[in-house]
From Swiss-Prot:
The modification Cysteine sulfenic acid (-SOH) is found at C15. This is Organic hydroperoxide resistance transcriptional regulator. Homodimer. The gene is ohrR. One of its GO terms (biological process) is response to hydrogen peroxide. The modification S-cysteinyl cysteine is found at C15. It comes from the Bacteria. Cys-15 is oxidized by organic peroxides to cysteine sulfenic acid (Cys-SOH). This can react with the alpha-amido of the following residue to form the sulfenamide cross-link. Oxidation or cross-linking results in the loss of DNA-binding activity and the inactivation of repressor function. Both the cysteine sulfenic acid and the sulfenamide cross-link can react with free cysteine or bacillithiol (BSH) to form mixed disulfides. Further reduction of OhrR by free sulfhydryl compounds restores repressor activity. The modification S-bacillithiol cysteine disulfide is found at C15. It comes from Bacillus subtilis (strain 168). One of its GO terms (cellular component) is cytoplasm. It is found in: Cytoplasm.
Amino acid sequence: MENKFDHMKLENQLCFLLYASSREMTKQYKPLLDKLNITYPQYLALLLLWEHETLTVKKMGEQLYLDSGTLTPMLKRMEQQGLITRKRSEEDERSVLISLTEDGALLKEKAVDIPGTILGLSKQSGEDLKQLKSALYTLLETLHQKN
């Protein structure tokens, strides 16, 4: 028989499963990213730039679900590492454009096997992972719209 507090057990908390899974996933990335001398958030920013080459800080923040207070210091560090350049837009001086440097672009080749390596650790079928990803995107969008 369920008691009225069963829903409050840690094992029944979706947020805990998401939090713990995220931490464990990030731990799996760490040794792979250490070889490239980048952090997980930097890797996510690079994924965007490898796809788009140049983005505004605002667009990057939207895509990464990060505010400028978190994103700007990370981008400054990436610029110091020689991975990106930051430049004011000529059309709109309020807008800052982020572009890959040659070194940042070259990291793509070194990182090419990372997604497959991580997926291989999950031991999930491709279909299961596709469904999980879809459910997580739906949850993310739903929660983000509440803000």
